[in-house]
């Protein structure tokens, strides 16, 4: 074979290949294959697809010798395929929620009909004619399951369904879709004709106060082996999956309630039946829970049904507390409109009425008002005002309806509006954000109302004065002053204030207000063009103090000669950065793209600035949306291009480089950081320098060259954690050392370093940084217990100026970093061990033991396998022993002494001598496998006269697997089994 061919073959063999999908006919050839396939966590094909394949193959028509289509033959192959489909459904516990979600109506109809046949229900028999009390349990369950599905399908067909948009299809595919649609409609037609029968059957099933059983894979196998065996082993057996009477009642009542509710519009008495069934379901849910392996009750939908039934069919028997919905419904029927208003006002404290319901009540009141009931006009405004305040508190814009009703404001309207605002903030839980929203609404109201008396009503109100900031109050006062200067002081009152045309200053103010609120680039441009057309000497980028552009950019932007272009660039960039800061990335992209398009025409420098900001935005967007998937090559290339950029005189924001470095580290693009970044950027940007050193260290791990690169990183971090020292003379004349923690000797402050690290997610990078800080922490002079970490040996063992290091800050940093790392991956045994060591070093023994046990659990499948020796080293075991000892759990101490490579008999015997143990004591003896310790326990209990405990110890010694003459393999197996059980019991105790 040539070298080229060998390379090609090696490359092909190294590619990961997806295992082939199991074909349906393979299950016919191997009886045991189906069960093995279903046990897989992500079986391919999935169970529901197998059902479709099996039934599709079993129902395929055949062709005779004359090429005529014949119905499928009843042969062994087809019977086996149908049985396989039933077994898959049995594996899914006959859960209709699962089956309905994945199977079409025709397929599920075929499946349940096969279940009826398998349960010996004669084809063509009317289920309503069957006496369920005399039938075997599995037959009853099959009949019940079919009729539950029938009425559920009827109910589901009553809901509106959004049509699925389909692209162009092949003619044969279109035919199949049309055939399936027609078949579904035919089945639905039959089900609806038999709906009353299905309801009667289910009502009868609810009268059977006994447990039910449904077929499992095992009972179906027995039926296939021996056709005479109808229901498992015997006719009246309880073989199969048990469904309790309460579970059956819960399912049946819920499904019957749904179908009765569907029939309510044509038969109002059905609402009462639905109410009774839903309330019974609610009682059963509180008793047995809303979910099981074979069913699930949607509690939110159930609550909605109960509320609707409480309104449509109020119960005189069951004393249910009147809900706001039912109260409003009754008030609407009796025309008690003040009662409706009272509920709306009270709801501002508890927010129980959703927005859709509020709007529907308002629409109904509007409709009645338009039909001639003029007295409702005032009520419509009041309800609309309540809804408007609710919308404002929930971040929604003010509706057009409110503006229409408030077009001619009056004293009464203002009084009511202020009352609603006050009520909405009466709760102790009213947040500062809610207060700010109401304050902004009232401020805007003052700026919009033309009648000065009404404006003074609002501005002089206690709520207004208490919530507005000084700056906002000044703005309103200035607005009133300007408005007052324009008002004619004649004694004759103006008949219609709305007939006065708006002045130019009013128009400018309105446009500036719109400019502040809008985030549409095109609209911003149009407003600025209008404003500059009115007056060209204003600097409109100063309209809002909230518009902030980084100082490094402002010089280039404010240097633009054309005033309109300057204002537009500044505002677009400021709004784009603001949207990015509040994580509204789509709008930020729209604004920055418009700004990029604008500056491309006249300024290469600003074009590069905008490209950099677009890159930063794309990184933020990617991290927020799909951070788990590898980024597209185009984004990686742009990040590399930014760090490799050598264009002079381009203002660079440090945060862009920081995010780019974090991005490359997270995706292991170490080559770019170590080889391709220009030296000038490394020297000028501390994050680039730190990222380069980190990348170089991670790249060399765990090789011998890692020590060299690690030394450079070590020196940089030590400098960051070092502070300048100052000497101060005390009153007694002695000189003491003062550490100035407000200054640093490094390339950045410690809090900046921690903030940067919290942008990293790559495990190796985090492990490297953790080991560095752990090593630095271990160098402090007063340390008692070292913390362990991976790769700790690559760091230097001493620091020239030890006194300059702020070890308190280092300790805080270690705790911060390990807590952050565990949010990234809570299953890293090395990080869990570091957390445990930290708790151990601070004498928090219970927490330390918890994390030591977690570290073992995550790498042993919760102690079902042996914990790797590199995780539970002798040092870790000794620390666990110390934790148990300090918690007075002395029996646990003795058992853990066996885990050491050399059993520590001295510590074990000393622990067992303690009589104030706070653990299970003799209940732990089954976990001891060392005969010497058990013999000592026997002697100890005999000496103390503790006969019962002595017998337990003797029983533990007498187990045959602990016999000293057994082979080493048997003894090792016995020890491992006891280790696993003991650690599992410890985990249950401390987790």
Curated annotation (Swiss-Prot):
Keywords: Chromosome, Nucleus, Repeat, TPR repeat. Residues 11-22 have a biased composition (Polar residues). InterPro entries: Int8, TPR-like_helical_dom_sf. A motif (WFEF motif) lies at residues 24-29. TPR repeats lie at residues 250-288, 319-355, 569-602, 829-862. Component of the Integrator complex, composed of core subunits INTS1, INTS2, INTS3, INTS4, INTS5, INTS6, INTS7, INTS8, INTS9/RC74, INTS10, INTS11/CPSF3L, INTS12, INTS13, INTS14 and INTS15. The core complex associates with protein phosphatase 2A subunits PPP2CA and PPP2R1A, to form the Integrator-PP2A (INTAC) complex. Component of the integrator complex, a multiprotein complex that terminates RNA polymerase II (Pol II) transcription in the promoter-proximal region of genes. This is Integrator complex subunit 8. It comes from Xenopus laevis (African clawed frog). The gene is ints8.
């Amino acid at each position: 074979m040539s070298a080229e061919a060998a390379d090609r073959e090696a490359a092909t063999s190294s590619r990961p290949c997806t295992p082939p999908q199991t074909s349906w006919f393979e299950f016919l050839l191997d009886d045991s294959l189906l069960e093995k396939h279903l046990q897989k966590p992500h079986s391919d094909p999935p169970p529901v697809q197998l059902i479709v394949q099996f039934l599709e193959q079993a129902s395929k028509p055949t062709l005779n010798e004359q090429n005529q289509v014949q119905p499928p033959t009843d042969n062994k192959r087809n019977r086996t395929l149908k049985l396989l489909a039933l077994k898959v459904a049995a594996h899914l516990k006959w859960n209709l929620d699962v089956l309905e979600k994945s199977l079409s109506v025709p397929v599920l109809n075929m499946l349940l009909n096969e279940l009826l046949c398998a349960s010996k229900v004669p084809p063509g028999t009317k289920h309503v004619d069957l006496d369920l009390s005399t039938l075997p349990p599995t037959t009853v369950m099959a009949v019940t399951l079919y009729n539950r599905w029938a009425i559920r399908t009827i109910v589901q067909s009553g809901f509106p369904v959004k049509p699925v948009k389909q692209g162009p299809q092949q003619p044969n595919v279109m035919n199949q879709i049309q055939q399936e649609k027609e078949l579904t409609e035919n089945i639905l037609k039959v089900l609806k004709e038999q709906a009353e029968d299905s309801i009667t059957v289910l009502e009868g099933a609810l009268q059977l106060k006994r447990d039910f059983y449904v077929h499992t894979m095992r009972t179906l196998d027995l039926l296939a082996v021996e056709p005479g065996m109808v229901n498992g082993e015997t006719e009246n057996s309880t073989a199969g999956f048990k469904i309790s009477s309460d579970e059956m009642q819960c399912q049946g009542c819920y499904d019957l309630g749904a179908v009765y509710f569907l029939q309510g519009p044509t038969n109002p008495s059905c609402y009462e039946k639905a109410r009774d069934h839903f309330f019974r379901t609610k009682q059963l849910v509180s008793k047995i829970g809303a979910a099981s392996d074979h069913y699930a009750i949607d509690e939110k939908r159930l609550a909605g049904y109960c509320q609707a039934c409480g309104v449509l069919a109020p119960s005189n028997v069951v004393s249910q507390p009147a809900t706001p919905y039912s109260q409003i419904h009754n008030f609407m029927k009796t025309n008690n409109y003040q009662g409706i208003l009272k509920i709306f006002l009270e709801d501002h404290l508890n927010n129980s009425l959703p927005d859709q319901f509020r709007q529907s009540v308002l629409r109904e009141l509007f409709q009645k008002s338009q039909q001639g009931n003029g007295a409702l006009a005032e009520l419509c405004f009041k309800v609309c005002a309540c809804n408007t305040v609710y919308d404002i508190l929930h971040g929604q814009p003010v509706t057009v309806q409110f503006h229409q009703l408030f077009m001619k404001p009056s004293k009464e309207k203002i009084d009511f509006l202020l009352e609603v605002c006050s009520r909405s903030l009466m709760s102790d839980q009213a947040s500062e954000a809610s207060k700010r929203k109401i304050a902004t609404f009232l401020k805007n109201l003052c700026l919009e109302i033309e009648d000065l008396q009404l404006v003074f009503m609002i501005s002089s109100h206690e709520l207004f004065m208490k919530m507005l900031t000084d700056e906002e109050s000044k703005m309103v006062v200035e607005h009133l002053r300007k408005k007052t200067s324009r008002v004619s002081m004649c004694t004759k009152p103006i008949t219609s204030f709305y007939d006065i045309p708006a002045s130019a200053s009013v128009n400018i103010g309105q446009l500036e207000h719109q400019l502040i609120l809008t985030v549409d680039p095109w609209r911003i441009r149009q407003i600025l063009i209008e404003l500059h057309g009115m007056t060209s000497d204003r600097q409109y980028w100063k309209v809002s103090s909230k518009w902030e552009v980084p100082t490094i950019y402002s010089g280039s932007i404010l240097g633009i000669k054309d005033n309109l272009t300057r204002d537009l660039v500044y505002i677009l960039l400021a709004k784009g950065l603001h949207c990015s800061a509040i994580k509204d990335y789509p709008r930020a992209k729209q604004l920055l793209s418009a700004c990029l398009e604008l500056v491309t025409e006249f300024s290469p420098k600003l074009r590069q600035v905008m490209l950099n900001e677009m890159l930063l935005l794309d990184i933020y967007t990617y991290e927020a949306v799909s951070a788990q998937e590898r980024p597209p090559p185009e984004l990686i290339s742009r990040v590399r291009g930014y760090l490799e950029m050598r264009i002079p005189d381009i203002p660079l924001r440090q945060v862009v480089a920081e995010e780019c470095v974090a991005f490359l580290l997270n995706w292991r693009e170490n080559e770019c950081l170590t080889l391709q970044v220009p030296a000038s950027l490394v020297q000028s940007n501390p994050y680039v320098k730190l990222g380069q050193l980190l990348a170089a260290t991670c790249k060399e791990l765990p090789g011998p060259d890692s020590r060299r690169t690690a030394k450079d990183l070590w020196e940089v971090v030590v400098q960051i954690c070092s502070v300048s020292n100052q000497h101060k003379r005390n009153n007694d004349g002695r000189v003491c050392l003062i550490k100035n923690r407000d200054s640093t000797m490094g390339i950045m402050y410690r809090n900046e370093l921690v903030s940067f690290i919290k942008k990293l997610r790559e495990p190796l990078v985090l492990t490297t940084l953790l080991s560095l800080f752990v090593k630095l922490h271990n160098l402090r002079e007063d340390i008692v217990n070292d913390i362990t970490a991976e790769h700790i040996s690559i760091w230097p063992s001493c620091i020239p100026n030890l006194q300059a290091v702020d070890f308190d800050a280092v300790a805080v940093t270690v705790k911060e970093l390990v807590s952050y790392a565990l949010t990234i991956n809570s299953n890293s045994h090395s990080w869990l061990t570091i957390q445990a060591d930290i708790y151990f070093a601070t004498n928090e023994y219970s927490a330390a033991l918890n994390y030591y046990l977690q570290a073992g659990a995550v790498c042993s499948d919760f102690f079902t396998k042996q914990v790797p020796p590199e995780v539970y080293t002798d040092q870790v075991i000794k620390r666990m022993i110390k934790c148990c000892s300090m918690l007075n759990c002395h029996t646990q101490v003795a058992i853990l002494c066996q885990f050491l490579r050399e059993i520590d008999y001295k510590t074990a015997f000393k622990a067992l001598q303690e009589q104030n143990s706070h653990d299970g004591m003799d209940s732990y003896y089954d976990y001891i496998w060392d005969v010497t310790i058990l013999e000592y326990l026997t002697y100890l209990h005999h000496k103390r006269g503790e006969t019962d405990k002595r017998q337990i110890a003797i029983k533990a010694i007498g187990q045959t697997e602990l016999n000293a003459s057994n082979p080493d393999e048997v003894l090792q197996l016995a020890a491992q089994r006891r280790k696993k059980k003991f650690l599992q019991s410890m985990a249950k105790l401390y987790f």
